[in-house]
Amino acid sequence: MQNRIEIAEATLKEDRLILTTKSEEQIQKAKASGQMLVDSDHFAFVYILENEESFSYLILGEDTWAPLKEAMTLDIPVYLAAEGHSLELIQLHQELHYLIDNIKDNANYGDMEEKVKSTFL
């Protein structure tokens, strides 16, 4: 995947989860798409960001899963942030629930199925 955005830190606040990245340029003009994919080879969920010319892929690896689960449990929004810019990741909870339901008991996802079950279910 080109235009990958990696998360440097996940910080749970009272009213939101903040995913911090060092890729400031990539999020300045980005818009949240409300759509996600699965990268089962790298054990990651992928949130799609749109800009005028292309897409960027926010990689939500295993190290972000526990904070994401907590944000889902608390029903608080998730934001992507970098150097004074922030962007709410709309529809993230709904998309993540949908993907988790599809992964559960589906051997097509290989080892990711067990990892998802142990964290989210």
UniProtKB/Swiss-Prot annotation:
InterPro entries documented for this protein: UPF0738
Superkingdom to which the source organism belongs: Bacteria
Record-linked Pfam families: UPF0738
Family listed: Belongs to the UPF0738 family.
Protein name, entry field: UPF0738 protein BPUM_1088
